Amino acid sequence: MQIVLISGLSGSGKSIALHVLEDAGYYVVDNLPSALLLQLVLHLRGAGYQRVAVAVDMRSGSSIAALPEQVESLRGMVDDLRFIFLEARDDTLIARFSETRRRHPLADENVSLDEAIQRERDALASVAELGHRMDTSDIHANTLRAWIKDFIGAAASEGLTLMFQSFGFKYGIPLDADLVFDVRCLPNPYYDPLLRPLTGRDQGVIDYLEKVPEVGRMAEDIRRFVADWLPAYMRDNRSYLTVAIGCTGGQHRSVYMAEWLARRFADRVRVIVRHRSAARRVQDAPPAVSGK
């Protein structure tokens, strides 16, 4: 039996994740009081369900504090347990609530939206450490859907999934990064007018960067560091390791580096590549990721 648990901050996109899992054939349970988690799993296992997705969050009230202990108990009950924790920056969450005109579950006439978000973040801090964290700040709903589909694919495979994620420092460091490397010291193709509209996946940018010796040296240093420590992360029984590569705008250098590294590890572990900021060159500001 495979269980996928979904938790996270209100407004981070949990309902989108559940819809993707439901479309993929999972039996979905939303807004389950965390105190009923073990009882639900026992019932569904007895009924013959093989793939189940359950959302547990602050709507469970104070019982959410017991979730870490329940998750540990659950690990001994099922063959495969995966946990996704969705989060986003405060400014992103505020913008989403403003756009959708929904009320935060912890907000009322005496508690502002800012304060409600902080209270929820504090209350879920221990829950966030239980599984794979996804930072949905500044992304489209379709991008989140693709991420969840990647996660489902990783859940179907054994062992660790290594994720290389490019980003732009001017948009903030991804909240879900395990390792962060800064490549802003490398020459920037942005200042070449012909390369400015391209990304690090385009051949012109690749040729530009591969002519610079420092680029190759830094790429090899990062590769060696990840390779040296990857066995330790694998021994820790992690499902995901997210390596974030950042440049100024997340369009050229970091994209190139993430792609380069992904190719070097593709024959060792399952590899996923995400580019958080590169799409900004052709997209307007993304719409809110609606959902809980």
Swiss-Prot record:
Keywords: ATP-binding, GTP-binding, Nucleotide-binding. The keyword ATP-binding applies. It comes from Azoarcus sp. (strain BH72). SUPFAM superfamilies: P-loop containing nucleoside triphosphate hydrolases. GTP binds at D57, M58, R59, S60. Displays ATPase and GTPase activities. PANTHER family: RNASE ADAPTER PROTEIN RAPZ (PTHR30448:SF0). GO terms for molecular function: ATP binding; GTP binding. This is Nucleotide-binding protein azo0399. ATP binds at G8, L9, S10, G11, S12, G13, K14, S15. Belongs to the RapZ-like family. Pfam families: PapZ_C, RapZ-like_N.
